[in-house]
């Protein structure tokens, strides 16, 4: 245990090293590592005037698994509208990264209490060469029960989790997003004493100020994923005088760290992209399309911390894709480093991307584009195409919005499908030579345009008539990829047959037609017999 704390303190001193050297140069002793379970600290000379040109850094480190509650007893710094002169900055973690900044403060109004989302918090005090005030005095403690949480993401646990929580506890947390953003709360473990009305031990989640619109949860069934009505979510945990449980663990996400996308196509990126993403975040992006669709994601840029050099696995910062709306869905892929992954496609209408970062080393992050893919069955003969699309996938659309080559070749509704049957000499088909093979090609259009906004999806339909093999490929032109079009030109190339079959939905494969071979053989045989007959006649 002592060795672990020693290593932790060495790490803290290394992180604070540059700040401590700067303070020594100014001749002012301040800052340091605070590792006791609780304590107090203040600006230099407090309560007298603090010195000019001073910068102090405090790193508060408590036992792992705990959190830090920071409160202020006194506060008096030079005032400025943007706190550009003298100021106090509070960071959620060890790194003074903008993404971890909980707030910058000056003037005479004390900052509110702050709770870290893990066991480390940083405080930086800065004064310039003009105007000094009395400074500040603050206190901290570990293992807090409740508090105000303001980071992009973090973890929330019951007291002493995963051990049983104490009796007669009452904890209040306020999770507050910046600006107009919402807060998302996801429970990953839950075991609280239960009864039918949750009147003994419970977790209550309130969507706004006051005890209104609240939901109470108890027992061992995890609560559903909850999203705030506004920019704030309140969580209350209460236990009675007997019978406990393991408690709960939940992740919260806010702002650009949690989004739900429901448009047919779009782009998004990691927080602060293309600048470095913050440390210690866990972000969710959910793509949710109407039933019947699949989601295809293209990676336009990826720059994360490199894999573990020993295990060669993504043990540190990583981006994961799940085939559904939660982390319990099948994993489609897990990536780190800077090599672009291939596109991934969901099997149904939802896909989740998760970004996890640790306490050190940040990079540029990622940028992706996605599009809703319509599963379809395409087959062909030596003379025509047949395309079948389930009406469930295109329920909001009229059949005339689905057409091959031109609007005159619109789909017909047959049973539960939209069907297009088109000869190779109609509907904009053309013959091309690809990989020394003759193929017939046309373009299938699905028009989602509405309210004056054009949105037409294009699929290349391809047939090799001699083998009666058909395939379909998503055509993604650069017009929908925004500023990343130059990096996504490869999307316009059709994938090989097996990739198209795996990623673009079912493709009908028909056995090779041997009638042409038989016909050619008969012609050759007839020619040989004719030559033999002529020779015999000449000999006679």
Swiss-Prot record:
Cytoplasmic side, ranges: 538-540
Gene3D superfamilies: Spermadhesin, CUB domain, Zona pellucida, ZP-N domain
Spans within the Extracellular topological domain: 23-516
Pfam family, one: CUB
Disulfide-linked positions: 30-56, 83-106, 145-171, 198-218, 257-283, 314-336
Signal peptide: 1-22
Membrane topology reported for the UniProt record: Single-pass type I membrane protein
Location of the CUB domain: 30-143, 145-255, 257-373
InterPro entries named among the record's database cross-references: CUB_dom (IPR000859), Sperma_CUB_dom_sf (IPR035914), ZP-N (IPR055356)
KW Ribosomal protein (keyword) present: no
Any GO CC annotation of this UniProt entry: membrane
Intracellular or extracellular location(s): Membrane
Domain of life: Eukaryota
Keyword set, alphabetical order: Disulfide bond, Glycoprotein, Membrane, Repeat, Signal, Transmembrane, Transmembrane helix
SUPFAM superfamilies in the cross-refs: Spermadhesin, CUB domain
Entry's transmembrane regions: 517-537
SMART domains attached to this UniProt entry: CUB
Residues glycosylated per entry: 40, 267, 377, 435-436
PANTHER family the UniProt entry points to: CUB DOMAIN-CONTAINING PROTEIN 2 (PTHR24251:SF47), OVOCHYMASE-RELATED (PTHR24251)
Protein name per the record: CUB domain-containing protein 2
Gene from which the chain derives: CDCP2
